[in-house]
Amino acid sequence: MQFPVDTHSHTVASTHAYSTIHDYLAVAKEKGIRLFATTDHGPAMKDAPHFWHFVNLRVLPRIWNGVGILRGIEANIMNEKGEIDYFGEYLSELDLVQAGFHEPVFAPADRLTHTRAMIATMESGLVDIITHPGNPAYPIDVEAVVGAAKACNVALEINNSSFTASRKGSEENCLAIARMATKLDAQLVMGSDAHVAFDLGGFDRSLAIVDAADYPRQRLLNESPMALLHFLQQRGHQHLDELIRYFRPVL
């Protein structure tokens, strides 16, 4: 099954990734992906794009050859206060703000520190999705984090790359998060975390976790473009009208 939405991809602007926006559009069209987000790493990462890269995402078309593009970022959680490395009025210009722990920016500490930082990030109201929360390098209090995600209407990502290319050993933590999300009816999303266009929409390992946790597939934000757009609209994003008009079902 090919889900039509992917919330997590990196372009050559993050120099450890290998594809352009044009590459992603071509693969999306080929695979039947209708909406994807370009979410390069926040500027605190050493090989991340400059702050201006995210400001200038406004030059991207909303829709190209039938594929919708969301202008986003995978920001870095900077500290225990939940601060991220993209801020101010420019945040409101983005369609999707994700954030997660990355070793070069936030050194692994202890379970309490990670939990506090992740919850503070969600409570800030600035972040829509927490990326790869099951990273074994950053153990968390799963019930506390998922409970906060539910309370803050923030989605937790089941990151497919965590089972293939990076963050080895994530399965147990991700399954625990997904099971708690099922129990608490918290919002999950699958992200390919593609660093090359061929991986866009690749969710096979993430979906296995979702299914093992008995989380309803129809609850995933990947289920349809409107599912994600409605979530982002609820979260206060105000520049989605063109995409909503395009993807809204005709009655």
Curated annotation (Swiss-Prot):
Binding site for Zn(2+) 1: H8, H10, E74, D193
GO biological process: bacterial-type flagellum-dependent swarming motility
Residue positions binding Zn(2+) 2: H16, H41, H195
Keyword tags: Hydrolase, Metal-binding, Zinc
SMART domains xrefs: POLIIIAc
Positions that bind Zn(2+) 3: E74, H102, H132
Protein name, UniProt field: Probable phosphatase Sama_2233
